[in-house]
Amino acid sequence: RQSRLQALRLRPKKLRENWVTYLAVNNSEANLLLKDRFAYTVLSHTDLTRETGQTGDIDLSRINWGNYDLVVIDESHNFRNDAFGKKDDNGKSRKTRYEKLIEDVIKTGINTKVLLLSATPVNNDLSDLRNQIYLMTGGKDHAFAESLGIPSLKALLKRSQDVFTKWSQVDDRDSHDLITKLPSQFFSLLDGLTIARSRKHIERYFKESLDQIGHFP
């Protein structure tokens, strides 16, 4: 019998119930997926920078951060900044959430796969998207050189951002013109990594599920 894969769900504090509901151990009547017997660790984004204390019944001081097969990051745009901690006058450095996630969870221990969930992956510019994708690649800029023909993620998204910036400054701009000017590799990246679901799409194709779990406000 194969051992169960170790999975971590990272989410904002306010979304805790969205995830713990589907844990089989809680045996919740609201769990429509109870037969799947889901088991995973649920933590907050802020728990990444806590070395002690509890989250639910989890002792943060005893977590083996490098032992997760899968990390699901809800509201992943909260990790759009790739800031790293700075040393103080005593030479000590406190890791940022981004640094803790990429260094201690994704790059340490076993091979970790990452799933990002976000309705707004880009807040400022395409560097937001780049930094989130780096969580998937463990910071490797050339990770898609063979699979998608993208030798440098950073270079591609910078080039794409430059095209968008110039296009946005034109008064009579149209979206078709932008699409024709963006690098073809940009669309290869989106096709290879993303699954997009709009509210309209969900309401049309997942009506039965919405009837069970609740509709959009």
Describe each model-derived feature in a short phrase:
Residues 2-4, 136-141:
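Post-Walker A helix-loop "phosphate-sensing" segment adjacent to the P-loop in P-loop NTPases
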Residues 21, 131-134, 155:
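CheY-like receiver
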Residues 1-25, 121-129:
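Conserved Walker A/P-loop ATP-binding site and its immediately adjacent core
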Residues 37-79, 83-121, 128, 138-217:
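Inter-lobe coupling linker of SF2 helicases/translocases
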Residues 17-42:
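Conserved nucleic-acid-binding Ia/Ib motif block in the N-terminal RecA-like helicase ATPase lobe
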